[in-house]
Amino acid sequence: MKINISLLWMAAICLLISGCSNYRELNELGVIIGMGIDHNDDPKNPYKVTYQVINPSGLAQTSTSGGKGLAVINYTVTAKTIVEAFARASAIIPRENNISHLSLIIIGEELARNGIDLLYDSVDRGKNQRVSVPIFIARGKTAEYLFGVIEPLEITPGKNIITTTKSEQSDYGSTNEVLLYETISALTSEGKDVSLPGISIRNDSKEAKQLSNFETTSPAYIEAKGLALFRKGKMVRWLDGETARAAQFVTSEINRTDVVIPCSEKGNVTITVIRAKSKMKTKIHHEKPVIQTSLNVMGEMMETSCDLDMSNPKLLKEFERKMENDLKKQIKRTISIAQKEKSDIFGFGDALSRTNPDYWRLHKKNWDNLFSDAEISMKVNVDIINSGMRMEPYKSK
């Protein structure tokens, strides 16, 4: 009898503890998927924070054929701190705020130039915050403005930004996705500075934030554009095009890209890079750091506008040497820019701390100046493994 009573008590307790006391219906939550942080001119409330919240009814309309309901709603507040902004947002978001599904953070360029090192404490400290969220810099605009652009192809602006950046990274390589924990690691590192991808608006107009942006064949849209260089938590300049891509070559962030080299006065050859791996070594010479970098590239010839026989192995070797020289010039130019800005976005200081810990311990406080004057040597090796499906070029009659 006692055993039966005990079993009943255990069953009752199991029923009680299996309940979800903190359960919430989706229509009771304000699911925040994007956060934008801008500088605010009011010194009492220096931050302007925009939250992009999922609109379930608009999402359903957008998913159906011909639906034009907005899938997201933006709410903007000003505050002294990021945490206070989240609390103030509860006064205007008509549902319980839920930030656990945050998918990206955008920082306005003005705020980035003022400094971002203090922002991440609140973002990283929150118990519901994921540290695998990508970070972007709004180029020439505010984060609030970019979140307001109505994208014709994607349901939400946030998703469009992420997919556009990933596409650019996989096909050209001048930008890359940088996550929150990687940014925090670089901000707290004594031997590496932060670099973050930029996003901008192409075909910007008054209609960019209107539903009429759906109704044109040349709409305003968001594009991945450039790499923002930081020094000690403050943005100092932009890198663009080949210069930005060269930085990704140094840090082995290139997945695929196309390199165009001349083959005549008017003709060019396009080499598609299918693999790129870099290594860096550091040493001390006469009490000064010497940085040695090497880059190994594998590529395929994908296009030529020159009348050349690509079956000739000597010709392929010639293109390999030309591509090596071009990449070497681009990388040296990029490193030179970074040295001028005293922004070690490559992590040369971290490499030096591992190979020469005693020297690093004595000079790490002065690394920005040492990096600026450091000797850099660059070695590039290119292997063109094939010339595509055709050896001879097409000739017009």
Language model region names:
Residues K2-W9, C14-K397:
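Membrane-proximal alpha-helical signals and transmembrane carboxylates
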